[in-house]
């Protein structure tokens, strides 16, 4: 009799614990990329799945990024950026690790207007365009890890990133995406880079909301440490 009472009590305890866990999960705020300006949230890293995900950094590192200054989105409004959000993030990364840096620049510069840039980006996506890159491309020989940085617009990286990745040989390179965004995180970079960086190994990426990039130092450092970078 005592054994049955003890068993029943234990089952009730387990049931109460399960219910409390479920309630907690439902009531916890979901962390999204659209936090308010005064919440001062630390940006959350986003994991990049891929056909060979799970790679760690190794060897000599190249950081290649595309960034756009000018009028930009800011919590539903507009603001002017002297330095684009992705470049701010790239500089923070460069300050922490030993790497070479290559800035991806278009032959046909994007408009200063945010809305005009959005429209052009959509047109290029719909046309599956390959915007031309100004200057020569870097040689990947000698590099084992490549950081790829870009903004995210209309849920994916600008098409100029595909221009870049399709023209280089990423076989056996470790590819590490990082992005700045309004609300789409890493977007479709996992799928897109898996298609264009054939034979690459993919490490965990990081997405930072554009408005929050100025105070993302802690998140960037934690991410770089987590995927195996030696800090400068």
Q: Which residue ranges define each predicted feature?
A:
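N-terminal secretory signal peptides
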Residues: 1-9, 24-25
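Extracytoplasmic entry segments of secretory-pathway proteins
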Residues: 3-6, 16, 20, 40, ...
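N-terminal export signals
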Residues: 13-34
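N-terminal beta1-alpha1-beta2 submodule of the flavodoxin-like/Rossmannoid cofactor-binding fold
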Residues: 33-143, 155, 225-231
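Active-site-proximal beta-strand/loop segments in catalytic clefts of secreted hydrolases
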Residues: 66-67, 104-107, 149-151, 178-181, ...
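Short, surface-exposed alpha-helical segments at coil->helix boundaries
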Residues: 83, 87, 91, 158, ...
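Helix-loop-strand module that forms the ligand-binding subsite of alpha/beta enzymes
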Residues: 111-201
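Glycine-rich phosphate/pyrophosphate-binding loop and the adjoining helix
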Residues: 201-232
């Amino acid at each position: 009799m005592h054994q049955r009472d003890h068993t029943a009590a234990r089952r009730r305890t387990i049931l109460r614990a399960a219910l409390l866990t479920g309630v907690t999960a439902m009531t916890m705020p979901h962390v999204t990329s659209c936090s308010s300006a005064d919440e001062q949230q630390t940006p959350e890293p986003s994991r990049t799945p891929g056909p060979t995900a799970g790679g760690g950094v190794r060897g000599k590192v190249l950081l290649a990024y595309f960034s756009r200054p000018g009028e930009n989105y800011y919590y539903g409004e507009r603001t002017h950026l002297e330095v684009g959000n992705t470049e701010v993030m790239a500089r923070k990364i460069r300050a922490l690790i030993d790497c070479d840096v290559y800035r991806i620049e278009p032959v046909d510069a994007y408009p200063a207007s945010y809305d005009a840039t959005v429209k052009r980006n959509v047109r290029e996506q719909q046309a599956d365009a390959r915007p031309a890159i100004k200057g020569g491309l870097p040689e990947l020989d000698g590099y084992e890890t490549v950081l790829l940085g870009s903004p995210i617009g209309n849920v994916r990286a600008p098409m100029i990133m595909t221009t870049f990745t399709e023209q280089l040989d990423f076989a056996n390179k470790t590819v590490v995406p990082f992005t700045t965004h309004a609300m789409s995180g890493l977007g479709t970079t996992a799928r897109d880079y898996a298609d264009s960086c054939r034979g690459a190994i993919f490490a965990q990426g990081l997405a930072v909301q554009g408005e929050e990039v100025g105070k993302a130092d802690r998140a960037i450092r934690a991410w770089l440490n987590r995927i195996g970078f030696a800090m400068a």
